[in-house]
Amino acid sequence: LFFFTPTPPYQILSGLVGSEMCIRDSALAVQPEFLVCDEAVAALDVSIQAQVLNLFMDLREQLNLTYLFISHDLSVVEHISNRVQIMYLGRVVESASTEELFKEPNHPYTQALLNEVPRLDLRKRNYTPVSGEIPSPLDPPSGCHFHPRCPHATSKCRNEMPVLKEIAPGRASACFLNESS
């Protein structure tokens, strides 16, 4: 799987991509069971990105790896993940299997995120960005951090922090809209 050479890494592959690939190889050389991948393919060209994602998936199967894959690119998340957690201002607002989350998002922030992902089957659709300014993570709003931008916000959302609760087996959301009336 790996080979070592006296050639310095910068001569094998140039720039950021080469050094990132060498870092990945070094991380795998110790045969980990768990690997944190923070924006692991963000700086890569789309064609290289696809190859690296396929490599990640192959290695997951061959080496029985578990990844914590952190990414802002939802198409990458959908492609590589079995489960997804969506965060807003440092708090998990939804957790579900990848298939469930992308098919039927529950939390208003997750819905807004997925609504902004361009899709071929919705080419003629007008995309409306989430309204309002993103609050500062250093001084987040009271209550639900998403309430200033949420179209469903109530006074309860402004005053109380919703807890991440199971809404179905293997699925959790932090939203007061899930409470039964």
Predicted regions located by residue number:
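A generic local structural motif
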Residues: T7-Y10, N54-F56, S131, E160-P162
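Conserved ABC ATPase nucleotide-binding domain "signature" region
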Residues: S19-E20, A50, P135
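Conserved catalytic motifs of ABC-family nucleotide-binding domains
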Residues: Q31
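P-loop NTP-binding/switch modules centered on Walker-like glycine-rich loops
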Residues: V36-L44, I48-N126
